[in-house]
């Protein structure tokens, strides 16, 4: 029961880390498109 919860937690952390890393890149791409 708890293993599933831990797995979800790990996936959520990976997604959050990915968003944090991707955030600046997305912002730069957005500015490049705006120009």
UniProtKB/Swiss-Prot annotation:
Localization: Secreted
Entry GO CC: extracellular region
Annotated positions of the Leucine amide modification: 35
Domain of life: Eukaryota
Key words of the record: Amidation, Antibiotic, Antimicrobial, Immunity, Innate immunity, Secreted
DNA damage found in the keyword field: no
GO BP, one annotated term: innate immune response
Pfam families for this protein: Cecropin (PF00272)
Keyword Zinc: no
Location, primary (coarse class): secreted
UniProt family annotation: Belongs to the cecropin family.
Function: Cecropins have lytic and antibacterial activity against several Gram-positive and Gram-negative bacteria.
UniProt name for this protein: Cecropin-B
Native organism taxonomy: Eukaryota, Metazoa, Ecdysozoa, Arthropoda, Hexapoda
